């Protein structure tokens, strides 16, 4: 049975993807891996890890700035430090940052029902990092970041435990170390948490892929001699954004003699009759991304192209047959030809 797909809207007459469950399950996965590890807390600067942890998003313009950061500890729920305007927006529209399931994080005086309690302090806070060095070190921002993190670790009794970080700028690392915090690699904890997808995550990945299906249909109609690779990129980007993509990360549009070796970047090359043309469409829908390839023959395919397609299809079918829980990439590549054979 395939994964169901729905419209991109929410409706009152049909149960679709449950975003509350998505948020709850992701945090539960992360806390499970955190509690299995040797670290007391996780600090994230990576855009995707912040979103996975806290379900906050401020637009993909900030994806490479390393200016936002988020912390989750064994004894508390996520805290996100963000631009002041963004922090205020989170406070208004991200109510999950004001509740917790952790006793040490809860407001002991606030009434509550069940396991979810109001927090003693909001998880939506104003605060920024060094913007990849754009702020002069004399401003002392790195030490301010370290001070914020140290306060939370002290508050929750974890100052003497290692702090796992996904990525970090050196001024921040040095400031944390000066504050007496032991910093270790936290990337694998995030990766372990994200490895097994929830039902909602699979649904979002399927929805993201279905949007690329639509883009490829338009691309099939568009491809002909005389159009350029960059025009194909523009077409795909428009289709995806019109369908609700939040970020078209890239479209590899590669044709003719540019197909081998793969240059990983499109050009303004004119597509010619009989060209092979392959595409890789990378985009994000609700934070779930595609890397979805398709190859076309422009006009008609030669006998050599037919033979190459047949061989490639056989390789793919062998690999797909091995995809199951517990399989590794080593199992897959074992049935593929060695690179030297090409």
Regions found by a protein language model. Name each.
Residues 1-342:
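Active-site neighborhoods and metal-handling regions in enzymes and metal-associated proteins
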């Amino acid at each position: 049975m395939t994964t169901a797909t729905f419209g991109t809207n929410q409706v009152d007459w049909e149960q679709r993807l449950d975003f509350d469950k998505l948020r709850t399950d992701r945090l539960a996965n992360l806390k499970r891996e955190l509690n299995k590890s040797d670290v007391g807390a996780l600090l994230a600067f990576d855009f995707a890890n912040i979103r996975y942890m806290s379900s906050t998003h401020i637009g993909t313009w900030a994806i490479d700035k390393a200016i936002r950061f988020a912390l989750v500890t064994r004894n508390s729920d996520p805290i996100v430090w963000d631009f002041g305007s963004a922090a205020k927006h989170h406070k208004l529209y991200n109510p999950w940052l004001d509740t917790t399931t952790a006793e040490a994080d809860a407001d002991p005086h606030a009434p509550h029902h069940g396991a979810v309690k109001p927090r003693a302090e909001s998880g939506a806070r104003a605060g920024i990092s060094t913007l990849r060095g754009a702020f002069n070190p004399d401003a002392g921002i790195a030490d301010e970041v370290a001070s914020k993190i140290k306060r939370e670790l002290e508050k929750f009794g974890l100052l003497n435990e290692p702090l796992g970080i996904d990525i970090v700028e050196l001024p921040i690392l040095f400031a944390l170390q000066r504050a007496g915090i032991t910093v270790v690699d936290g990337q694998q904890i995030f990766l372990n948490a994200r490895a097994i997808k929830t039902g909602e995550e699979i649904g979002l990945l399927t929805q993201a892929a279905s949007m690329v299906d639509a883009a490829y249909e338009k691309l099939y109609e568009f491809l002909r001699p005389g159009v350029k690779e960059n025009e194909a990129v523009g077409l795909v980007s428009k289709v995806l954004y019109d369908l609700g993509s939040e970020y078209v990360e890239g479209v590899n549009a590669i044709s003719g003699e540019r197909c081998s070796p793969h240059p990983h970047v499109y050009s303004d090359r004119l597509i010619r009759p009989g060209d092979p043309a392959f595409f890789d469409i990378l985009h994000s829908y609700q934070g779930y991304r595609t890397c979805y390839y398709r190859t076309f023959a422009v006009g008609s395919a030669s006998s050599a192209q037919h033979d190459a397609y047949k061989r490639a299809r056989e390789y793919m079918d062998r690999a797909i047959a091995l995809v199951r829980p517990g399989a590794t990439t080593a199992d897959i590549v074992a049935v593929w030809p060695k690179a030297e054979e090409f």
